């Protein structure tokens, strides 16, 4: 009888490329979920479960794991708030005030975690984008939006402005229309 000898390659440990803030927020969410379960706070429990499932789905969908940072959390949280605001409008239109109130309370829970993230606010982004675009307008007054996006160093901007590339893009587009069209 022959024995097969398998060489067992040491399992490579999955390296997490997440920022420490990302991991801290997830840890806080899990701790708060346990606390909500022990205090039987159903609303907070479902809101935190929803947040954690959204984060997990984003982790699964992410092609580049290094993009899982506080900025991706900020984008996910703001998307969740926008979805709930849309739901509230629908519930009010259909005279379901009880469900609208539930979603308002979930927004409060999500906003609690959103405010804890060290990310620039929308007003800060708007002022930084305005300043940035005015500087570009002085050097190149006939700049087009496509040319602008080609000139932007996105890695430097996300670090300097403390915001995700997605939120910077949307802010620059909205401010570009105001500055370069006038």
From Swiss-Prot:
Gene3D superfamilies: Uncharacterised protein YqeY/AIM41 PF09424, N-terminal domain (1.10.1510.10). GO terms for cellular component: mitochondrion. The keyword Mitochondrion applies. SUPFAM superfamilies: GatB/YqeY motif. Keywords: Mitochondrion, Transit peptide. It is found in: Mitochondrion. The keyword Transit peptide applies. Residues 1-17 form a transit peptide. InterPro entries: Asn/Gln_tRNA_amidoTrase-B-like, YqeY/Aim41, YqeY/Aim41_N. One of its GO terms (molecular function) is carbon-nitrogen ligase activity, with glutamine as amido-N-donor. Belongs to the AIM41 family. PANTHER family: ALTERED INHERITANCE OF MITOCHONDRIA PROTEIN 41, MITOCHONDRIAL. This is Altered inheritance of mitochondria protein 41, mitochondrial. It comes from Candida glabrata (strain ATCC 2001 / BCRC 20586 / JCM 3761 / NBRC 0622 / NRRL Y-65 / CBS 138) (Yeast).
